[in-house]
A protein has these predicted regions:
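Surface-exposed acidic/polar loop and edge beta-strand patches at domain peripheries
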Residues: 1-150
Length: 150
């Protein structure tokens, strides 16, 4: 049976999804996966995710550990791209380049969320012009906990 709990840390929530085989902790800040506990061969739970000890560490990191990134994952050279014969200038956060969505990419956003029967869905609206990107983008991230998988 799935158990779901929420803990509040200011404007950030940690959501825990737990069943007999897995414990997933995630947050509405960057949709970070904080931890994933699974059983070893001796039936003992252990965390298999690289992460931090506190929410503040996630807020202050610059390595994207556990977070989703975007609008673009990877580096955009010279922080510019062309679309339909128009050049767009993006936020520079990696020397002259744009990396993983920029200075305030998805990894730094606080998402709205909805608890589901079997998991959690996160929602965010990236508005046109955010970090230099054109057009609105509706984002949905779902973490669904099945018997022994997410």
């Amino acid at each position: 049976m799935l158990q779901i709990s929420e803990q509040k840390y200011g404007d950030i929530y940690v959501i825990t999804l737990q069943n007999d085989d897995l414990i997933l902790k995630t947050t509405n800040f960057g949709c970070n996966i904080i931890s994933l506990y699974t059983k070893d061969k001796n039936n003992i739970f252990g965390d298999i995710v690289l992460g931090f000890d506190s929410i503040d560490d996630y807020k202050n990191q610059d390595k994207y550990i556990g977070a989703i990134v975007g609008r673009c994952a990877n580096r955009i050279s010279n922080a510019t791209f062309s679309l339909n014969d128009k050049e767009y200038k993006l936020a520079k956060n990696n020397g002259p380049n744009h990396l993983h969505g920029g200075i305030n990419g998805f990894d730094k956003k606080i998402f709205k969320y909805k608890i589901l029967d079997n998991g959690v869905e996160f929602f965010y609206l990236s508005k046109s012009g955010e970090e230099g990107y054109p057009g609105n983008l509706k984002l949905k991230v779902s973490y669904i906990l099945n018997e022994n998988s997410i």
